[in-house]
């Protein structure tokens, strides 16, 4: 009895896919180069990928520089988080197709660990911290707590007075403490080469200065001169302005020729309504 055996042939591949390849050479090349290939050498990572579209096939080569950087433990743990969406199959770290690195933004802390506020002084370029109590800003010229010595509006006046005092001391040193023919000490103001002066004659003009606060932002020097000129002769008007924006800070100093005029200006203009604000006029504090 004869026995016949039938062998089952393997199924034919999809003809549509074969016709799309075009040739067996391209099919072999596609199997060989299919998917991305990565190679790392001397800290340089090269990723080669083949992209096909209607216009043809393109070979994309991306080069990365591998840098080993030590980071804190929380940062390293965040990089291991599971990705989602279109990036769920990507490896750890940023991917060029979905992530790009923007410019670095530095964080500036305005308080230290003790909770004290830190201020940055642009003119001196030093950083200091304030304490929780007491006044921080202080001027060594006019003794005011509103500004620093470097930005004092009366610094030139005080410097001139200091130069005059230094010249008078040098002159007194040359003349000597005694008068010829006498063994007694004579005060500098009682000597023959200098006229006798009183304390009122050497009174500084800053004592004739009043401080004006709660000023409107659009108020200028001419408007203040016109307002305070109704009381007396105004020698100087200084409006404090911000050094970065050049906008008024809301206060000014007005210097009169006589102290009585300053007192009259305080009595008349304290509480005066200018635009939509009420002015506060007071003596400049000298301590």
Swiss-Prot record:
GO terms for biological process: formation of cytoplasmic translation initiation complex. Residues 208-286 form the RRM domain. GO terms for molecular function: RNA binding; translation initiation factor activity. PROSITE patterns: RRM. Its main location: cytoplasm. SMART domains: RRM. GO terms for cellular component: eukaryotic 43S preinitiation complex; eukaryotic 48S preinitiation complex; eukaryotic translation initiation factor 3 complex. The keyword Cytoplasm applies. Residues 163-207 are annotated as: Disordered. The keyword Magnesium does not apply. It is found in: Cytoplasm. Gene3D superfamilies: 3.30.70.330. HAMAP family: eIF3g. Component of the eukaryotic translation initiation factor 3 (eIF-3) complex. Belongs to the eIF-3 subunit G family. PANTHER family: EUKARYOTIC TRANSLATION INITIATION FACTOR 3 SUBUNIT G. RNA-binding component of the eukaryotic translation initiation factor 3 (eIF-3) complex, which is involved in protein synthesis of a specialized repertoire of mRNAs and, together with other initiation factors, stimulates binding of mRNA and methionyl-tRNAi to the 40S ribosome. The eIF-3 complex specifically targets and initiates translation of a subset of mRNAs involved in cell proliferation. This subunit can bind 18S rRNA. This is Eukaryotic translation initiation factor 3 subunit G. It comes from Brugia malayi.
């Amino acid at each position: 009895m004869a026995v016949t055996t039938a062998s089952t042939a393997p199924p034919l591949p999809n003809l549509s896919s074969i016709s799309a390849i075009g040739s067996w050479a391209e099919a072999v090349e596609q199997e060989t180069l299919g998917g991305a290939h990565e190679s790392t050498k001397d800290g340089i990572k090269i990723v080669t990928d083949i992209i096909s579209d209607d216009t043809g096939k393109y070979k994309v080569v991306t080069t990365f520089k591998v840098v080993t950087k030590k980071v804190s433990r929380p940062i390293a743990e965040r990089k291991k988080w599971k990705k989602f969406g279109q990036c769920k199959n990507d490896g750890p770290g940023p991917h060029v197709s979905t992530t790009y690195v923007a410019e670095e933004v530095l964080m500036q802390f305005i308080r230290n660990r003790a909770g004290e506020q830190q201020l940055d002084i642009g003119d001196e370029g030093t950083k200091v911290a304030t304490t929780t109590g007491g006044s921080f800003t202080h001027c060594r010229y006019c003794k005011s707590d509103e500004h620093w010595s470097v930005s004092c509006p009366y610094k030139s006046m005080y410097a001139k007075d200091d130069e005059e005092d230094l010249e008078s001391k040098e002159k007194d040193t040359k003349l000597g403490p005694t008068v010829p023919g006498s063994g007694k000490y004579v005060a500098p103001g009682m000597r023959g080469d200098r006229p006798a002066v009183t304390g009122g004659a050497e009174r500084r003009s800053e004592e004739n200065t009043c401080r004006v606060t709660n000023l409107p932002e659009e108020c200028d020097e001419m408007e203040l001169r016109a307002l305070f000129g109704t009381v007396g002769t105004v020698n100087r008007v200084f409006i404090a302005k911000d050094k970065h924006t050049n906008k008024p800070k809301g206060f000014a100093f007005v210097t009169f020729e006589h102290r009585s005029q300053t007192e009259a200006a305080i009595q008349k203009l304290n509480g005066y309504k200018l635009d939509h604000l009420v002015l506060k006029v007071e003596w400049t504090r000298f301590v």
